[in-house]
A protein has these predicted regions:
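Conserved GNAT acetyl-CoA-binding A-motif
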Residues: 99-109
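Conserved acetyl-CoA-binding loop-helix of GNAT-fold acetyltransferases
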Residues: 82-96, 118-122
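Active-site acidic-Proline motif in GNAT/NAT acetyltransferases
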Residues: 77-79, 83, 111-112
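A short beta-loop-alpha structural element at the N-terminal edge
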Residues: 1-15
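Alpha-helical elements of Rossmann-like donor-binding domains used by nucleotide-donor carbohydrate transfer enzymes
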Residues: 14-17, 30, 34, 88, ...
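Acetyl-CoA-dependent GNAT
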Residues: 6, 10, 21-73, 77-79, ...
Length: 146
């Protein structure tokens, strides 16, 4: 069964194997502690472990854009991709955001990222517009009412 939860310092070794091979356990624990502060640049931000049973298969973050708009960013680690974890992680993250009072989910997806577009459409998102992001890349904005 897939679930999301906050990261714990005990997750550092598993994160080192899956994502942060070139960081020490202490550096990874510092990253986890920063995530658990639930803020980034003065806005609400929360990072969750995506778990299948007790095994971490990825992460998903929530980022506040306004009092009513939030976005989520999933990262499923390489050995676990293409198994439906991204869909489950986003469903759980957006359910959590709805419980917190958010009304709209927003996603910025590169125009060449067909897999992400399909995933968001499967989740009920609709394409709203196209724009150039801060990195100079063409992206679509997808929106969904929570």
């Amino acid at each position: 069964m897939v679930s999301i939860r906050n990261f714990h310092e005990q997750d550092a070794r598993q994160l080192q194997q899956l994502k942060y091979q070139y960081k020490s356990i202490e550096e990874i624990k510092e990253i986890i502690n920063l995530w658990n502060e639930k803020a980034y640049n003065g806005s609400y931000y929360e990072m969750f472990a995506v778990c299948d049973q007790d095994e971490i298969v990825g992460s998903v973050s929530l980022y506040k854009h306004s009092d009513y708009i939030i976005s989520a960013g999933p990262e499923i680690y390489m050995p676990y991709r293409k198994k439906g974890y991204g869909y489950e992680a986003l469903m759980l993250a957006y359910d959590y955001a709805k419980d917190l009072g958010y009304k709209i989910a927003s996603a910025q997806i590169r125009t060449d990222n067909v897999a992400s577009m399909r995933l968001h459409e499967k989740l009920g998102f609709q394409r709203d517009c196209e724009m150039i992001n801060r990195k100079g890349k063409s992206v679509y904005i997808y929106l969904k009412q929570l």
